Amino acid sequence: IREAAEINRLCGEWNIDYSAYEGGIYSSEWFWAKALHVLREDEHVRAKAYSIVEYCEWLPALITGVTKSDDIVRSRCARGHKAMWHEQWGGLPSEEFLTTLDPLLAGFRSRLFEKTETADKPVGKLSPEWAERLGLTTEVVVAGGAFDCHMGAVGAGVTPHTFVWVIGTSTCDVMVATYEEIGHKLIKGICGQVDGSVIPGMVGLEAGQSGFGDIYAWFKRVLEFPLKEIVGKSDLLDEEMKERLVTEACNRIIPALTAEAEKIP
């Protein structure tokens, strides 16, 4: 959270607002905030770190046999939405911006990348090792990486003027727009508007809630606490009855609350 606050403050003071295409506000869950937090907190990682990679870039690189950081194909989706990458300012935020944010970031920009690719472009073919492990052939083409909700929108058949809601541990609201329609508009408060992050040749827009299913799971555990800790340890019932009662009650909590909530005018 501290790192994100520092990034937002510096974006507001700098001659270029690098958060402009990310809704005008940078999240603590995103690339630079996470990387800086790790560099500050972990001396061992700080001493050894050469570059920084997103998981959706690392996995395609791994299974295609890429072993050098410089050869990893970088994701337009990941970098545009989370790393403040944009062609308008030549890719990533400037070295001066990053080192002003924290000198610990010095040198990383030159060891990262300038270019990103959309997910429709193959990154290579399965390496012999992974072809054997997966029971496939080395002719299998591996697509570029992107975030799960963006690819969920592709799978749902997203088109302009449709809205795809991807619900899970978080909720992601995804749309696409033509260049002509979005023009020079900058939409405040969303998680980014990125050329080609969903469908190449269109601007992908993402919004949503970073916590959704996780919060429901936490809430359910809070409500279950007296059942498991009091009923589950009661001496008034035998073990089988306690287990059945606790399981039934836990399974009915959220549906029962939902039914009551639906009655509220």
Identify the residue ranges that each predicted region occupies:
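Short hydrophobic-aromatic micro-motifs
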Residues: Y26-S27, W165, D173, V203-A207
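Short glycine-aspartate micro-motif
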Residues: I52, E139-A146, G155, T162-V166, ...
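Glycine/Thr-rich phosphate-binding loops that ligate phosphate moieties of nucleotide
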Residues: I1-E13, E43-A47, G65-S69, A83, ...
